[in-house]
A protein has these predicted regions:
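Short alpha-helical segments and helix-capping/turn motifs at coil-helix boundaries
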Residues: 23-25, 42-45, 104-107
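Short, glycine/serine-rich, charged loops/turns that create anion-binding
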Residues: 19, 44, 125-126
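A short, basic/flexible loop-to-alpha-helix module at the beginning of a structural domain
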Residues: 1-10
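Helical element adjacent to the flavin cofactor pocket in flavoenzyme catalytic cores
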Residues: 174-180
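Glycine-rich FAD pyrophosphate-binding loop
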Residues: 29-53
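Dinucleotide-binding Rossmann-like beta1-alpha1 core, especially the glycine-rich loop
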Residues: 57-169
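N-terminal Rossmann-like FAD-binding beta1-loop-alpha1 element of flavoenzymes
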Residues: 10-38
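Short, solvent-exposed beta-strand edge segments and adjacent coil->beta transition regions
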Residues: 9, 116-118, 175
Length: 180
């Protein structure tokens, strides 16, 4: 880490120079422009750990493809509650970044914001059954209405050709896709 001058009494200290600290810092500055903020990063470059594309799915944790937000209960049911809460938070963050673009505080967002489909892929009968139940549970919420579910091999090849490469048509598999 390079040497830097450190304030003696900042109002806020943020640990890590990744997307979360950057976002929180910008929110705090928007709410209180005179606030003093210090960011401490142990690495030589900002956003090289969890925020780096090689270490993170880059999905913004929208709950569109993260299966851990919809665990299956012992009775086989799936609650969409946590996924809906995460998706709502994701939408609020998108609104915030859109506001920053409108205020010309973020320029050329197309250079760093890339819309890509959010996909979940599973194989095996039990996992296919789970993904179908997850999809059905999420369909009750408008944020997930545009999500697609398929067990169609050809469609999955179209959605994710590299994932499907070398797979057999006879294997049980399913996928969901959410374009954003």
């Amino acid at each position: 880490m390079s040497d830097t001058t450190i304030r003696t009494n900042p109002d806020v200290i943020l640990i890590g120079a990744g997307i979360m600290s950057a976002t929180l810092g910008v929110i705090l500055k928007e709410l209180q422009p005179n606030i003093t903020i210090e960011i401490h990063e142990r690495l030589d470059t900002a956003a090289c750990e969890s925020s780096d594309a090689w270490n993170n799915a880059g999905t913004g944790h929208s709950a569109f493809c993260e299966l851990n937000y919809t665990p299956e209960a012992a009775d086989g049911t799936i609650s969409p509650k946590k996924a809906i809460s995460i998706a709502e938070s994701f939408e609020v963050s998108r609104q915030f970044w859109a506001y920053l673009v409108q205020q010309n505080k973020v320029v050329s967002p197309e250079k760093f914001i890339k819309s890509v489909p959010h996909l979940s892929f599973v194989w095996g009968e039990k996992n296919v059954e789970y993904l179908k139940k997850r999809f059905e549970a999420l369909q009750s919420n408008p944020l997930f209405k545009e999500m697609d579910f398929t067990t169609d091999f050809s469609l999955m090849q179209e959605w994710m050709p590299l994932v499907m490469e070398g797979r057999e048509l006879t294997d049980a598999m399913a996928a969901t896709k959410m374009d954003i």
